From Swiss-Prot:
Protein name from the UniProt record: Uncharacterized gene 23 protein
A Pfam family of this chain: Herpes_BTRF1
Chain intervals with Pro residues compositional bias: 179-199
Region of interest: Disordered: 179-200
Lineage: Viruses, Duplodnaviria, Heunggongvirae, Peploviricota, Herviviricetes
Similarity annotation: Belongs to the herpesviridae BTRF1 family.
Amino acid sequence: MIRVMAGAKFLNGMVKVAEDAYLFHVIHSKSLAVLMGTADSDVPLPLLFSKFPGSPTNAIPLYCYERPRLSLARLILSGHPYALHSELEIGFSDAGGEITVYRCPIVKYTDFRDEPVKADCTLMFSSREDMSDATPLTEDLYPRIGSRCKIKHVTIDESKNQSFFFDKDAAIRAPAPCSPAPCSPAPGSPPPPAPPAAPAKPIIKCQLEPADEELARFTGYARIFHAISTHSPKIGSCGAASYNTVLIMTRSQNSLRVLPRDGSITPRHNLFLKHVILKEMGLENSVQDFEVLYGDHLGPVTRQQAEEFRETVRGLRCKLEDCVFVLNSVCAAPFSKPVAAGSTGPHTLLLLEKYFLTFNPRDKANAINFGAAVTELIFGGVPFTKILAFVQKFIEILTETPEDNMFKIYALLTN
């Protein structure tokens, strides 16, 4: 924590220390950047505060019924994503008016202990309110913000740390075999030849080729996928946090059935497949929680099984992109006639209801029913050319692709 000079004040997610001194945090999260619509993966917290206006100073709530994107931000930042009564705080002001800024923003709960956001962050300094000349806060800038503390504190100089790297390709030599001491050579005879050096052997006998790194990763996924079929984690015999996270997500974030025609796929298989896709896209995911639950119960899989799992994930990602492409047109379509839900599954209707709560369509009721039917056709295996031929009979197909498609895929996978 950093205390700043008198006269400082909170201003829309940042601290105005003086006319030419501002402090704010930057969150490093690709998922949050997609949510905010920024080009890179760094999101200044004042930008997040400005997206959810009101009268924010040092904190914003992470739940609002009328602003569903706040809930998505909570899923990205909070260690307890289902704790609705929580808020994001960058610092506080004590009774004397002195402002203290957290090194990392804090998520405050009513039911859990406060904790830092789970995404990486950096405390930044800028001389302008628009943050155009921002730089990471370093010790040489402390005099400009009046950093002080009433108790003794220790500063760690990270530059004095030492590290050593070992070359994995370096060779080692086997010890030479023992042999009796040679006899003294006769006078005038040539010296005996030196014993041959032991051949060099690599430290690592076998290395994976670069092309096999992806297959090795999917081999790990496939082992977890098969372990889900053979092992049922029980509370008390595994990590409680991971157990509760997977249990709740299986029930509340599992509306999309990615393999509806495969009767062997359980809801937990379905959830794991979706989070593998999220991880491969570089988005927030819970694959690590599955590793905690099933890491001690993994069995071997063949190369063919790993390749089949990889192709399954690739195919599902293509279907997600196709689905978002069609839903963009559904969102903009003015339906001339009412669309009935028909035989569409209630879980798919719920998925589209939550999806269109974030991306407002022109005709919500008809968009939900029509979009749900098309979604089931796509993931049911109907060729995309037939899907387009069917859809364009009722609505116009948009050919332009918006920039927030990745965020829409994230919404489909996490609702």
